[in-house]
């Protein structure tokens, strides 16, 4: 059907044409090579990637979308066609497609096929920096990254294999928009036992990470144009998403006792929502005091407002037991509890959840149906097994011990080499450190210099909504595996600090 060199014709053909030919069986390996070109794949074949195959398929499609090589409305191969070309199980391709659908990048149109979504999430609307190869270690001092070297990959792979072997036709379907029932049951059981949160599986909604949880919440509570208390400083990426959803943020200061509820009331008593990280404030690491918890719940009950509890880093507490969830103290049912497995297991999981009050189950269910943020069933069922079989709690116990050790490595190195420039804040838990600047140099200048030198340091001031929040550096320690590595990082940071403040 092409004149001249077929490879040249395929190279210049629109992706939708190539996908259509592939679906009709009219092209073979050349067709897949063309698809690889469009997806900007690595030279190594799919089977050589260190990622699970479904994640590698997902990654390649995301990269092509982010770089603008696949656009809204472009057709993609059917699950069956792509599985045949790659010589892999249909369930593997289905898992990748479900993940892309749940995040809003694909639209499944039944017998009409699957296409790139007409309206892409904002993150995909402009080219993004190319991610490092999957074999690369996380950037030094990167925040929010669990210890990937300590994740039980063989165990996880075995659970995935077991799930695939017992997969039936129903399991390959799109699944419930609220999430796999087995995972919702497992989460409800875990929260009751370890976080003091009593709920039914019907109150649990599985989302695509914390961002997916916020998107569902904003839709269900109709937050566009509404005001929301937001911790200052607070999680910068959530702040961006909320603004994109049309939420008007009311900055509320954070001190040693957490969110200053009285300040929130003075600034906007009638705010519809408050978002808090009560167990381990992001990024300062303080816990919301009992007095402040009671005041926050009383305000929500009196005003008819809602509180979103982001249970951020609650499981990683190195001094004493994990603090009780705010939801466990919520007698008037005004708290929506949010959790995520990404920082406890691995970021690529993209698995978060919401526990909503019984009165909101129907409302959130309608929003879930409208948004169609379906997650990959295979991932959800594997995570359910991981929880139900006790692997999750054992993994957390191991990680607490490991993180306490690695935290000590980095603190010691910073105190040994950078004490003239930095003062490390004492924190009872979490997977990040905050080091306050002792010298009069803007933290964003230091952070930029550190980033250019390969250190993924964040400036504290970038996390604030109002000026005067202090100057400091935020850094992760979970992948600082040895004291020697910590010392090397401390010396590199010292050189940067000296250059910024000679």
State the predicted function of each range.
Residues 146, 278-282, 343:
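Short glycine-rich anion-binding loops that position phosphate/pyrophosphate groups of nucleotides
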Residues 233-236, 461-465:
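Short, polar loop motifs at secondary-structure junctions
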């Amino acid at each position: 059907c092409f004149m001249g060199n077929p490879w040249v014709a395929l190279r210049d053909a629109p992706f939708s044409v190539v996908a259509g030919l592939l679906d009709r069986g009219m092209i073979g390996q050349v067709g897949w090579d063309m698809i690889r070109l469009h997806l900007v794949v690595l030279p190594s074949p799919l089977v050589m990637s260190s990622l699970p195959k479904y994640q590698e398929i997902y990654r390649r499609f995301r990269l092509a979308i982010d770089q603008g090589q696949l656009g809204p409305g472009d057709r993609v191969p059917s699950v069956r066609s792509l599985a045949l070309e790659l010589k892999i199980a249909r369930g593997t391709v289905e898992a990748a497609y479900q993940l892309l659908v749940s995040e809003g990048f694909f639209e499944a149109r039944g017998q009409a096929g699957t296409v790139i979504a007409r309206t892409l999430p904002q993150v995909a609307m402009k080219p993004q920096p190319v991610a490092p190869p999957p074999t690369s270690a996380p950037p030094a001092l990167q925040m929010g990254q669990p210890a990937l070297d300590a994740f039980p990959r063989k165990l996880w792979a075995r659970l995935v294999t077991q799930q695939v072997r017992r997969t039936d036709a129903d399991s390959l379907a799109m699944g419930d928009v609220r999430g796999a029932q087995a995972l919702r049951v497992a989460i409800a059981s875990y929260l009751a036992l370890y976080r003091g949160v009593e709920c039914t599986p019907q109150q649990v909604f599985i989302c695509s990470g914390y961002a997916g949880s916020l998107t569902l919440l904003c839709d269900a509570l109709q937050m566009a144009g509404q005001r929301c208390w937001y911790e200052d400083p607070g999680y910068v990426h959530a702040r961006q998403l909320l603004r994109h959803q049309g939420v008007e943020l009311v900055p509320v200061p954070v001190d040693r006792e957490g969110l200053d509820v009285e300040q929130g009331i003075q600034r906007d008593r009638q705010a519809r929502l408050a978002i808090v990280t009560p167990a381990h404030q992001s990024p300062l690491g303080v816990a919301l005091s009992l007095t402040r918890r009671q005041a926050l719940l009383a305000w929500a009950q009196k005003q008819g407002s809602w509180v979103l509890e982001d249970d951020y880093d609650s499981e990683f507490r190195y001094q004493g037991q994990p603090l009780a969830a705010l939801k466990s103290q919520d007698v008037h049912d005004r708290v929506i509890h949010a959790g995520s497995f990404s920082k406890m297991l691995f970021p690529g999981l993209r698995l978060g959840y919401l526990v909503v009050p019984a009165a909101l189950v129907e409302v959130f269910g309608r929003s879930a149906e409208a948004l169609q943020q379906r997650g990959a069933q295979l991932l959800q069922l594997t995570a359910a097994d991981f929880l139900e079989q006790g692997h999750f709690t054992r993994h957390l116990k191991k990680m607490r011990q490991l993180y306490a050790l690695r935290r000590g490595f980095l603190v010691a190195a910073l105190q040994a080499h950078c004490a003239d420039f930095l003062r490390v804040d004492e924190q009872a838990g979490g997977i990040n450190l905050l080091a306050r600047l002792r010298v009069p140099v803007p933290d964003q200048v230091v952070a930029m210099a550190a980033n250019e030198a390969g250190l993924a340091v964040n400036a504290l001031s970038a996390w604030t909504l109002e000026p005067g929040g202090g100057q400091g550096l935020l850094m992760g320690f979970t992948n600082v595996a040895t004291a020697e590595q910590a010392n090397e990082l401390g010396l590199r940071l010292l050189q940067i600090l000296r250059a910024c403040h000679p």
